[in-house]
Amino acid sequence: MRQYLALFAVAFLLAVGPARAAPEHALTERALGAADAPVIIHEYASLTCSHCAAFHRDTLAQIKSAYLDTDKARLVFHDFPLDRLALVAAITARCGPPERYFGFIEVLFRQQEQWSRAADPRAALLRIAKMGGLSEALFDACLSDQGLLNAIRQRAEDVSRRHSIKSTPTFLIGDRRIEGSAPFAQFKAAIDAALAAAGKS
């Protein structure tokens, strides 16, 4: 993955011009739910992954209502870009205001087929970026920030080695692992088991 994304990065950086800096918050944790929740749901996702989009469309709302909004669990979103467009989309989302991040990625998932298959994906992503509060100047600054690109790529490689993550979406919940498209019942069983292990059932 490193070589492929690195070659793409060089081409894309040349396209957006001289290097500038992304906002300092671009690499901070992105999470939903209370910081002190007893259970952490780690989601590893690629923004061009159709099964990831299905999770956000069909299942996340149920998890949010049952566990995140009740302070029983916290969902931490980890970028795991599987292709060049997913990497660019991840950078774009992280450069927006942190409080709008999950709204931003929900739009990216809902409109995934449109922007990922567009003849000009940069223009398609820029349109979404502007809806999320980014200027074109900030959009270009983020895409030309080699440090941000390297950091996202390195994080994905690190978790791939540490947790043997090879596909998306992958979820780690306590000692349980969920891969691919799964129904809410499967997440409920894993979260309830983790709550029981934490003495919070």
What are these regions (language model features)?
Residues 2-82, 153-162, 193-201:
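Extracytoplasmic thiol/disulfide redox context detector
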Residues 3-5, 22, 46, 60, ...:
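C-terminal cap of thioredoxin/glutaredoxin-like
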Residues 27-28, 42, 71, 83, ...:
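Generic signal for short, ordered secondary-structure residues
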Residues 29, 77-80, 113, 140, ...:
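Conserved short-loop catalytic and cofactor-binding motifs
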Residues 32-35, 43, 95, 116, ...:
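Short N-terminal micro-motifs specific to bacterial/archaeal maturation
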Residues 38-39, 99, 166:
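Structural motif
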Residues 45-47, 53-130:
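Structural alpha/beta surface segment adjacent to cysteine/selenocysteine redox centers
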